[in-house]
Structures are given as C-alpha cells and as structure tokens.
Amino acid sequence: MLVRSVRFFVAARTVEQFPQPLEGDVCFAGRSNVGKSTLLNILFNQKLAKVSKTPGKTRTINFYLVNERYYFVDLPGYGYAAVSKTERRQWKKLIEDYFSLRKNEIKLSVLLVDSRLTAQESDRIFVEYCEYYGLKLLIVLSKTDKLSEAQLKKVVQYFSDEFGSEVIPYSALTRRGVREIVERLAKALE
C-alpha cells in the first residue's frame, strides 16, 4: 500500500507558507473540475481533499503529508475557473514559484486531463513547465468510463503523441487505472 498515513498539512497562499521539503513531492495538476481532488481521495483512501462541482474550488497549493515522508501537492485547477484575472495571475505566479523553488524535490508531476477533450493550451503550458524544470511527467486521463474501448485507445495514443509522456487511463467511477497510478507513484518515490 502506497499511502499508509496521510494528513492535510497546509494550504499555501504564499511561498513563505510552503513547508520545509522532506523526501520528495508529487504534484497534481489539471484544469478545474478534472478530478484532482477525487483522485487524491482515492489514493488516500479517505475524503481528505475537498471535492466540489464548482470549478476553481482549490485556490491554494494544498500540501498533504504522506507517510511522514512525502508531500502530495494539489495545485489550483486552471482553465475556466470563475475567478478574477488578478486571482488567476496570483495562482500562476504561485505555481511558477512552487516549480522554481521545489524543482529538486518534485519526484513526479501528475497532469490530469479530461479524456473527452483534446489537449488544451493550459495543459500544454503545464507540460512546458515540466520540461523546462526537467520534471518527470505522468498524464492521467480522467473520466474514461464515458468512452468506448475503441475511443479510449485512440485518446491514449493522441495524448501520448501530443505530450510524449506516459499515459494512464483512469476512472474514479470504475477505479480503472488506480493500481497503475499507485505503481507509478511508488516507483517515482523510491
């Protein structure tokens, strides 16, 4: 089992609130309402991350202390969140600061993308951040239970070609892909 203990650690609005690094971070990113908090709750095996149907609920960088050794980091959702341009700029700066300051601690960046959509510009920008900072990237396709197997095969190939990264199809509903995600996280944290 990957997560033996977990607790919410801090909701950081500024870099000064980032906790001292431990043995590594795994950060989770994606557009608003793509399912980051739901995936985290599945990995934690408890409802610790707040889930909302309202886009843009995560407005801070949320650090969860896992096994007293690592941080799983929930980045604010980007995209269509109904927030002001000023607040979006603040999020962007905070995320850029996170990458810049913790690039050596980030063991894996997990980008959740909606399997029913094509790659969005905001997803491409996140991938570029990862490439710029030399971070390992895992693409997790969410909501795959909405696709046929034939559609899913095409979508996996599309995102693999688009981002040149490992792609894992995942469904919160059926739990498809959870084992593979856990294995990939465990490998990154070795």
Predicted ranges, named:
Residues K57, Y70, G77-Y80, R116-T118, ...:
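Conserved nucleotide-binding/hydrolysis micro-motifs of P-loop NTPases
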Residues M1-A82:
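Conserved G1/Walker A P-loop phosphate-binding module
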Residues L2-E16, D145-E190:
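Canonical P-loop GTPase G-domain recognition
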Residues P19, N62, V83-S84, Q120-R124, ...:
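Short, well-ordered secondary-structure micro-motifs
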Residues N67-I106:
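Conserved nucleotide-sensing/catalytic segment adjacent to the nucleotide-binding pocket
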Residues L22-E23, N41-F44, K85-R88, R124-E128, ...:
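Short, glycine/charged-enriched secondary-structure capping and boundary segments
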Residues K93-E166:
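Conserved C-terminal guanine-recognition region of P-loop GTPase G domains, centered on the G4
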Residues N33-V34, N41, N62-L65, R69, ...:
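Structured catalytic cores of enzymes that bind and process phosphorylated ligands/cofactors
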